[in-house]
Each structure stands twice: as C-alpha cells, then as structure tokens.
C-alpha cells in the first residue's frame, strides 16, 4: 500500500510540470519513470511466480491505453520497457514453469495472456508515424507469435507440434488477409516453414513400418492441406499481397505443400514402391496444372518427373548394393508401374503443351527450363522409356534383351503414330536401329543358336511391321510428321 501511494504521488507530481519548462519537464519525467519502476518492483515483490509476466504485460497495456488519452511522451517508453522485461521474464521463467492453477497449466495461462496483450500493444501503443510506416510496431506482434510458438512447443506432444504450428500459421495468415496486414502473413509463412521443418525431426519416422493410417499420416497430411489452402487463399490481383508474390511466398508455400507429400510418400510406402507413389503424384500435379491453369504445378510435376527418374535409376535399377548381391534384385513391377503412370500423364502433358506464356529472355538455364515447360510431353515420355529400356537390359536374360528392346521399339512407334509426335517416332526407330546394331556387333557372334534365331525373327518382324506402317500410312505420317 505504501509503495502504491508513493507511486501515485510521483505520477501526480509529474503532471504538474508545464511542457514549456524544460528543467521541470525533466524532473517530471524522472517522477513518472520512478513511479512506474516502483509499481513494477512491487509486482515482482508480491508475485515472484508465474503470474509476474502477465502482470507486467497488463501494466504496459494500461500505460499504452492511458497514453491514448493523455499523449505523454514518457508513457510509450515506459510501456516499451515493461514489455521488454515481460518478454525476458516469459522466455526465461514462464516457459519452464510446470505448476498448475485449478487444474490449468500456469505456463499456458500466463503466456497466453502475455501474447494477447502483446498483440494488443502492436495496435494501441503510440509511435511516430514514420516508425509505423516501417512496421516497427509489429515488433510486438512478432514477439507475441514467438511466445505462442514456444508455448505450443512446450505444451503439445512432440508429434502434435508441427500440426499446432501449421494451424497457428493458418490463423495468422487468415487474419493478415482479412485485415490486410502484411506482417501477420509473414509471421504465418515463418510458422508454416517451421512446421514443415519439424516433420523431418519427429513426424516422418513415427508409427510402425507398413502402417497406412497412423501418426505419420494423420499428423503430416493436415500440414500439406493447410499449405495448399494458404496458397489457394492468396488473391491473384490484390495490391496488399503484391509484395508477397514479388517475394515468391506463394511459390514457397505451394512447393512446401508438394514437398510435404513427397516426403510423406517416401516414408509411408515400401522402399521399392516409392518411385510409383511419386509417379502417381506427377499425374496429380499435371492434372492440377491443367484444371487450375497454374504453371507452378507444371513446374513441380516436371521436377518430380526428374526425381522419379533419379530414384528409379539410382535405387530400383542400380541399387543392387542395397540387397547385398551383385545382380539386380529390385521389383521390376515397381518400375513398370511407375513408367505406366508417367505415360498416362501424357494425357495431361499434351494438353499443357504451349499453354502458358513463358519469357524467352534470361540466362541459358532459364531459357532451357522454359523450353522444357513449353513441351512437357517430351520429358514425361523419355523418362519412362529410359527406365523401361534400362530395366529390360538388367532384368531380361542375355539372349532376350534385344528381343525385348525390339518389342519396346514397336510399342513406342505405335504410341508415336497414335499421338502424332515426331520425337516419339524417332525414338522407336532409334531403338530398332540399336537392336540391329546389337545383333550385328554382339548377338550374332555370342548367343546360342536358339536365342540367335529368336532374336532375328522378333527383330525382323518388328522391322517388317514398322515398314508396313510406313507403306500403308505413308501419306498420313508425312502430314503430321
């Protein structure tokens, strides 16, 4: 009581100085700061526990509200000082406070109050206009978001932290969109990025091997949905999100969503079938690019196609060391299924050809990427053809490799005839020429009699069939080729 009365007296004395009297004003400032310091010290003395931080935060809020009416230059600085010591107290003491109050966590209640007050201070505390134009008042909202994120870290179970951060990021993003406040959206992007990083340390390895619906699935799938939802919520032409797009936050969020699913599939499916799941995702991405008219999903689909090729070659085909033997023991059905899925994606890739207007300027790499995106069917075709070609070379017996390549060449040529694509036709012819060259250089001299005759017969039939197609449909072929 005594300290409270002294503080009240000091506040009263500080109000008696005229603003024009410089020395009296300095003394008045001293009185005001002394009063605030006494009350802050009193709170520390009376409540040296988990409730001190919210008391200091509430005191800072009261000073900010009083300053809205009184317009005293010292009150905002006192609020800043109280907020600073509140933040230090919250991070150094309250985060590690484990006691309960009426069955509720003191840490949860106290830090929630501090965070709410900090969000309020970002709006109420008085600052010079030039400071607000620089968004310096959002130091408080950033501090509040950090407190909430740390609170979620300590209060939630390890597997729930990523989901908690993602939901928190979604709330911040929606508020930033609703109120057109960029800083809240930036905080949302940081929270979503942190949630994405978190799954690599806890969620992806959760659950039992082979378990389809388990902790891994139901904690990571919501994150991917939230990331895609945030991407879809970004308006295309509104000025207040122009900077978000200029900084490519929309691209970042969309790529994080796809990367989340890619990582989930890597840990969710048996190691041999990862390549198939990724190929299915390519199909979905190209379909989304066509349905939503978004070149971003086309980029992701083509990038993932390259990942399918790398995974198929490095693990499924040439990953014999994983199985402890020199011969290939991988599942040929997995590579075949992945290749079939990519070939099915041609239905979307052809319709995406030349659909998006891409710049012709830039570096050589940029021009190469844009050229590939203008003709996505080329990459989507050649990747499965190469995978199947290498798979046949590794899987088939020595005497049947050329035979299998000849059959593949005929199928490729028939596909080229069906879709009317020159590069596909040339690929089929190239495979046939490879078969002829292999027969002349290796098979004729090294195969057994039976395998030699089978190879010659099958390749001869393939050449005859292709020649028949050229003769029978020569005019049609010349029209579109």
Residue ranges of predicted features:
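Alpha-helical transmembrane segments of multi-pass membrane proteins
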Residues: 1-481
């Amino acid at each position: 009581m005594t300290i409270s009365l002294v503080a009240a007296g000091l506040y009263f004395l500080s109000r008696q100085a005229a603003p024009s009297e410089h020395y009296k004003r300095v003394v008045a400032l001293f009185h005001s700061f002394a009063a605030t310091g006494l009350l802050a010290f009193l709170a520390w003395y009376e409540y040296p526990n988990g409730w001190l931080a919210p008391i200091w935060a509430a005191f800072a809020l009261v000073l900010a509200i009083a300053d809205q009416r009184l317009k005293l230059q010292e009150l905002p600085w006192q609020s800043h000082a109280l907020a600073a010591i509140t933040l230090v107290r919250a991070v150094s003491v309250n985060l590690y406070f484990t006691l309960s109050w009426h069955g509720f966590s003191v840490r949860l209640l106290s830090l929630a109050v501090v965070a709410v007050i900090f969000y309020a201070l970002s709006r109420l505390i008085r600052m010079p206009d030039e400071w607000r134009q620089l968004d310096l008042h959002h130091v408080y909202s950033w501090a509040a978001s950090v407190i909430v994120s740390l609170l979620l870290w300590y209060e939630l179970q390890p597997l729930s932290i990523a989901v908690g951060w993602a939901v928190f990021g979604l709330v911040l993003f929606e508020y930033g969109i609703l109120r057109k406040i960029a800083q809240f959206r930036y905080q949302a992007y940081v929270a979503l990025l942190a949630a994405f990083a978190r799954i690599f340390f806890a969620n992806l390895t959760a659950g039992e091997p082979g378990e389809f619906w388990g902790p891994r699935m139901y904690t990571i799938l919501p994150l991917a949905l939230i990331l895609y939802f945030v991407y879809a919520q970004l308006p295309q032409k509104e000025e207040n999100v122009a900077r978000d797009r200029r900084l490519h936050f929309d691209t970042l969020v969309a790529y994080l969503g796809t990367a989340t699913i890619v990582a989930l599939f890597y840990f969710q499916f048996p190691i041999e079938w990862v390549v198939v799941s990724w190929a299915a995702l390519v199909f979905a991405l190209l379909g989304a690019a066509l349905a939503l008219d978004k070149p971003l999903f086309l980029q992701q689909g083509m990038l993932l196609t390259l990942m399918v090729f790398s995974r198929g070659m490095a693990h499924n085909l040439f990953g014999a060391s994983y199985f402890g033997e020199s011969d290939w023991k991988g599942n040929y059905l997995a590579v075949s299924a992945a290749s079939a899925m990519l070939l099915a994606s041609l239905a979307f890739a052809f319709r995406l050809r030349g659909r998006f207007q891409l710049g012709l300027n830039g570096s050589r790499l940029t021009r190469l990427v844009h050229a590939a995106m203008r003709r996505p069917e080329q990459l989507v075709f050649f990747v499965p053809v190469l995978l199947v070609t290498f798979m046949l070379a590794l899987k088939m017996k020595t005497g049947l490799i050329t035979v299998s390549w000849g059959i593949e060449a005929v199928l490729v040529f028939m596909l080229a005839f069906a879709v009317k694509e020159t590069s596909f036709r040339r690929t089929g012819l190239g495979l046939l020429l490879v078969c002829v060259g292999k027969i002349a250089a290796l098979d004729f001299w090294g195969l057994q009699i039976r395998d030699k005759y089978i190879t010659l017969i099958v390749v001869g039939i393939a050449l005859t069939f292709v020649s028949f197609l050229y003769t029978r449909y020569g005019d049609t072929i010349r029209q579109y080729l």
